Amino acid sequence: FEPKRRGTDLNKALEFLLRVQSHKAVAVVVSDFIGSPAETRRTGQRQLRPQLQLLESLAQASFSMLKQVNRRHDVVAVQITDRYELELPALGRLVLCDAETGEVMEINTGDARKREAFVARQNKALAETARLFRSAGIDSVQLRTDQPYGSALAKFFETREKRRRHG
């Protein structure tokens, strides 16, 4: 398997926005907000055990850039997660390849304790990402690829509008 890309760089997109958009704008950032292992190492965040290193909390470098953009613009973060980023099916030993980096890892999904630890870690990472957005004053919504998103987005923007009108 040869990855089509060598990763994505959210910071480059955000830096571009800061350069080209001089007037205040609503910037909707759609991402999984998963920090790459290299980005995590650069920013000093604690590494997860390699066999469970599928989802990490928002990397500090991207978060700093999002805060910077939010000072000039109105940032809305839409976090997309896949079912299998949040849970591991009991399929035994799996070899996984990261489509962005090409990194290959083997994990044993047959171990119930590892699956439970994985789910707990992923939920903690999602909660931490949402907390970081709130602390920076960035409105955010989490959507899953295996669930309908239309009503969730409508409710999010409806609630956001009410809060902005009355807040």
Regions found by a protein language model. Give the residues of each.
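Generic enzyme active-site microenvironment
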Residues: V29-V30
